[in-house]
Curated annotation (Swiss-Prot):
One MF annotation (Gene Ontology) recorded for this entry: L-methionine:thioredoxin-disulfide S-oxidoreductase activity
Organism: Listeria innocua serovar 6a (strain ATCC BAA-680 / CLIP 11262)
Annotated HAMAP family: MsrA (MF_01401)
Transmembrane segments: none
Family that this chain belongs to: Belongs to the MsrA Met sulfoxide reductase family.
Record's catalysed reaction(s): L-methionyl-[protein] + [thioredoxin]-disulfide + H2O = L-methionyl-(S)-S-oxide-[protein] + [thioredoxin]-dithiol; [thioredoxin]-disulfide + L-methionine + H2O = L-methionine (S)-S-oxide + [thioredoxin]-dithiol
Keyword annotations from UniProtKB, A to Z: Oxidoreductase
Catalytic residue list: C15
Record has Oxidoreductase as a keyword: yes
Keyword ATP-binding: no
GO aspect biological process, one term: protein modification process
Function noted in UniProt: Has an important function as a repair enzyme for proteins that have been inactivated by oxidation. Catalyzes the reversible oxidation-reduction of methionine sulfoxide in proteins to methionine.
EC number(s) given by UniProt: 1.8.4.11
Protein name per the record: Peptide methionine sulfoxide reductase MsrA
C-alpha cells in the first residue's frame, strides 16, 4: 500500500465511537479517525458539536487502499452499522450531530453511494424509505484524542454503549443472517 494509492472515505452514522471498529478491522484500511464535518464552525469541540450549534455531525474519516478494500465494500459496511431510515439521529443519539450521511470525496464515490442507496431502498429490507443523506465531503476536523480508537481504549464502555444505545440489537435484527 503506497501513500499515492490511498483514498479517503467519510461516513456519519451516529456516535462515532461505534463507527470505527467495523472499518478498522477490515483489510486495506490504513486508519480511521473520529471527528466532525458538515458544519460551519472551524475546529469545533465535542461539547460544541453536541450543543447542536455548529452544523457538524460526528463522523469517521477512513484512509483506505481501494485495490484491497474498494469503496463499494466500505459503503456496504457502512449500511450495516446504521438505521438508514432514521434521518433524525441514530438509535439513542438524536439530533443533527448524529444524522446519517455518506460524505463523498469525488464523483465516483457519489455515484457508488447513490446507486447503493437506491438498491437498498428497493430491496424491501426496510418498511420505511432509506433517508441517509449523500453530501459532498467538507473539511474534516479530528475529534479530541480521548475519542480516537475508543473501542480499543475503553473496551467495556464501548461494548456496553453498543448494547445500551440499541445499535447492537438493531444490527442483529436487521443486518445479521
Amino acid at each position: 500500500m503506497t501513500k499515492e494509492s490511498l483514498e479517503k472515505a467519510t461516513f456519519a452514522g451516529g456516535c462515532f465511537w461505534c463507527m470505527v471498529k467495523p472499518f478498522d478491522t477490515q483489510p486495506g484500511i490504513e486508519k480511521v479517525v473520529s471527528g466532525y464535518t458538515g458544519g460551519h464552525t472551524v475546529n469545533p469541540t465535542y461539547k460544541e458539536v453536541c450543543s447542536g450549534t455548529t452544523g457538524h455531525t460526528e463522523a469517521v474519516e477512513i484512509t483506505f487502499d481501494p485495490a484491497v478494500f474498494p469503496y463499494e465494500k466500505l459503503v456496504e459496511v457502512y449500511w450495516q452499522q446504521t438505521d438508514p431510515t432514521d434521518a433524525a439521529g441514530q438509535f439513542v443519539d438524536r439530533g443533527d450531530s448524529y444524522r446519517p450521511v455518506i460524505f463523498y470525496h469525488n464523483e465516483e464515490q457519489r455515484q457508488i453511494a447513490e446507486k447503493s442507496k437506491a438498491a437498498l431502498d428497493a430491496s424491501g429490507r426496510f418498511k420505511k424509505p432509506v433517508v441517509t443523506e449523500i453530501a459532498k465531503a467538507e473539511t474534516f476536523y479530528p475529534a479530541e484524542e480521548y475519542h480516537q480508537d475508543f473501542y480499543k481504549k475503553e473496551k467495556a464502555h464501548y461494548e456496553g454503549y453498543q448494547v445500551a444505545s440499541g445499535r447492537a440489537a438493531f444490527i442483529d435484527a436487521n443486518w445479521k443472517g
